[in-house]
Each structure stands twice: as C-alpha cells, then as structure tokens.
Swiss-Prot record:
Keyword Protein biosynthesis assigned: no
Highest taxon of source: Bacteria
Descriptive protein name: Small ribosomal subunit protein uS7
Organism: Aeromonas hydrophila subsp. hydrophila (strain ATCC 7966 / DSM 30187 / BCRC 13018 / CCUG 14551 / JCM 1027 / KCTC 2358 / NCIMB 9240 / NCTC 8049)
Gene3D superfamilies reported in the protein's UniProt record: Ribosomal protein S7 domain (1.10.455.10)
Subunit (UniProt): Part of the 30S ribosomal subunit. Contacts proteins S9 and S11.
rRNA-binding in keyword set: yes
Record's keyword terms, sorted: Ribonucleoprotein, Ribosomal protein, RNA-binding, rRNA-binding, tRNA-binding
Stated role: One of the primary rRNA binding proteins, it binds directly to 16S rRNA where it nucleates assembly of the head domain of the 30S subunit. Is located at the subunit interface close to the decoding center, probably blocks exit of the E-site tRNA.
Cellular-component GO terms for this entry: small ribosomal subunit
C-alpha cells in the first residue's frame, strides 16, 4: 500500500428538489443498477407520502428517523493470541450516516407494502417514532458493544 497522500472524501452535490446533501446520499443508497431517476422517484414519493400522512415537514421526519438509527458504537473483530475478540469502537460520523441509511433501506426492502415508496415511507415513520427494524438493528449493535465492553482496552 503506497504511503502517499490521503485521498479526501468526494463532495456530493445536494439533491435538486430539497437542496440536502444527506438526501442526495440517501438517493444514491436506494439506487440499484445505476438507475438514479428511479431511486429519486422512490425517495421523493416516500417523502410525499410522509407529508400527507403526518402533515410535518418532509426533511424534518427524514432527519429525525436517521438520528434514531445512527449507531454511536459498533464492534470490530480483533485477533489477540489465538482468540478473536469483539472490540467495541466508536463509529466515525461519515460511517454513522452510511450505516443508518443502509439499515433503513434494508429494513424497507423487507417490509410488506406494495411499492418501495410505501415501504420506505413506513420505515421512515417507524424510525422517527423509535420503532421498526432499522431501530432494532441499531439497538442490537449497541447491545453487542455493551456486552463486550470488557474488551474495550484492545483498541487499536
């Protein structure tokens, strides 16, 4: 691995409708096979469903849902001597967002509603209310970190 300069994070353009970089990133996470227009239609459709159901601001519900899903700590495998330990480590801010979005989309895909926009809207609303599969996933990760707190001194 070359020890040259560290390549910086690429700047993502804000989405055209709401001007949010976070939402633009989320559209990219929802995207499958490079079909961005389809993923934009799904995300914007889900936000419209949320606005009609709750009467709240679209982005406010989206932000609240992501806040409830973002993990603070996670476990990483660390091999010491012949044993592998699950070591709790703090999650970097960029990875927090990435994990939250990935878990949200995965949970939405497993739901039973007809269209993906409806599934995504349902999961976003559940996450905003601290319910749903994506919030459960975050709780499981936190529980794993809590259970392995004794190995925190194996940090790297």
């Amino acid at each position: 691995m070359p020890r040259r300069r560290v390549v910086g994070q690429r700047k993502i353009l804000p989405d055209p409708k709401f001007g949010s970089e976070l939402l633009a990133k989320f559209v990219n996470v929802v995207m499958v096979d490079g079909k961005k227009s389809v993923s934009e239609a799904i995300v914007y459709g889900a936000l419209d469903i949320i606005a009609t159901k709750t009467g709240k601001e679209h982005l406010a519900v989206f932000e609240e849902a992501l806040d409830n899903i973002r993990p603070a700590v996670e476990v990483k495998s660390r091999r010491v001597g012949g044993a592998t330990y699950q070591v709790p480590v703090e999650v970097r801010p960029v990875r927090r967002n990435a994990l939250a979005m990935r878990w949200l989309v995965d949970a939405a895909r497993k739901r039973g509603e007809k269209s993906m926009a409806q599934r995504l809207a349902g999961e976003l609303l559940d996450a905003a209310d601290n319910k749903g599969s994506s919030v459960k996933k975050r709780e499981d990760v936190h529980r794993m970190a809590e259970a392995n707190k004794a190995f925190a001194h194996f940090r790297w």
